[in-house]
């Protein structure tokens, strides 16, 4: 009987297929169980780290912070939560004093954040922002005066909220602060060498005597010219900012908004102010020698004693 023969021939294949399907289901089930187990381990690690943040011991708290950093590296799903937790830690443990010291232009010489605050800032600075998933690093109204260098590599605070933060004497060298909110922040005597502030919002910010450019130069590989280590303030909003006495020599301020800004006694030698808006700005005794001023708007600006401005502005 032909069908009996066909059945006999097909049975081994059917059995093999059944075995394959069973194995596939087992592998799938094992994979699901493994993911559940891994997620459970991360949850346990997260809970332990959070508990450590509440410890009285600085060493235990630091351990908790670095444990959260490892969780960010191991779990992209938990990355945004960790960013929010660490940001909240800074806001809770380093708030502005009730006196509102961020409005003062006094220096913060000798002052620096506690070790745990510095550590949290370092962790946030070196996270992978691609996994933030819309979460903002919210350090608004915090006291970060005297913040030390955050090391080498990528220092990313792009689009961070630093509204009203006290950053007097902070070292923000080479940090990416593009599109960051720095409304009313105090950056008196802060170091901004090589900082990217492109499109940042600095309305009412205080940058008195801020170190913006270094005295050293490097050779630009594209142009072959000597270039200063200066921040990029292209299109930055500096409306009503206090920049009196600031060292802004060779700074890129292309298209920047400086309406009503206080630039008295500021050094802007060699700065690029192409298409910048300086309407109603106070430019008295500022030095614009060698600055690029094509397309700059100076309507209503106070220019008494300013050097390097076109005669038509007087």
Q: PLM features: what roles do these ranges have?
A:
Residues 92-95, 126:
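Membrane-proximal, non-transmembrane interaction modules
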Residues 133-314:
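Tandem repeat scaffolds
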């Amino acid at each position: 009987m032909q069908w009996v023969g066909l059945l006999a021939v097909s049975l081994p294949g059917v059995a093999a297929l059944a075995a394959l399907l069973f194995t596939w289901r087992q592998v799938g089930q094992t994979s699901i169980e493994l993911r559940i187990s891994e997620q459970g381990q991360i949850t346990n690690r997260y809970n332990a780290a959070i508990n450590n943040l509440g410890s009285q011991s600085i060493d235990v708290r630091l351990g908790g912070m670095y444990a959260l950093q490892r969780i960010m590296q191991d779990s992209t799903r938990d990355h945004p939560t960790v960013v929010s937790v660490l940001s909240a830690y800074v806001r809770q443990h380093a708030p502005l004093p009730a006196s509102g010291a961020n409005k003062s232009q006094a220096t913060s010489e000798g002052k620096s954040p506690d070790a745990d605050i510095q550590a949290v800032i370092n962790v946030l600075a070196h996270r992978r922002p691609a996994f933030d998933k819309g979460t903002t690093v919210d350090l608004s109204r915090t006291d970060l005066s005297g913040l030390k260098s955050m090391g080498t590599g990528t220092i990313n605070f792009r689009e961070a909220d630093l509204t009203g933060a006290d950053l007097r004497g902070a070292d923000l060298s080479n940090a990416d602060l593009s599109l960051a909110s720095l409304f009313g922040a105090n950056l008196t005597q802060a170091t901004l060498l090589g900082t990217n502030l492109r499109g940042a919002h600095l309305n009412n910010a205080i940058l008195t005597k801020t170190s913006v450019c270094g005295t050293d130069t490097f050779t630009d590989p594209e142009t072959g010219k000597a270039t200063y280590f200066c921040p990029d303030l292209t299109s930055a909003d500096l409306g009503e900012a206090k920049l009196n006495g600031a060292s802004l020599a060779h700074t890129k301020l292309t298209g920047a908004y400086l309406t009503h800004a206080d630039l008295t006694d500021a050094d802007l030698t060699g700065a690029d102010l192409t298409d910048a808006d300086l309407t109603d700005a106070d430019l008295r005794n500022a030095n614009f020698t060698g600055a690029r001023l094509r397309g700059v708007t100076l309507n209503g600006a106070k220019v008494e004693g300013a050097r390097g401005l076109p005669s038509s502005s007087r």
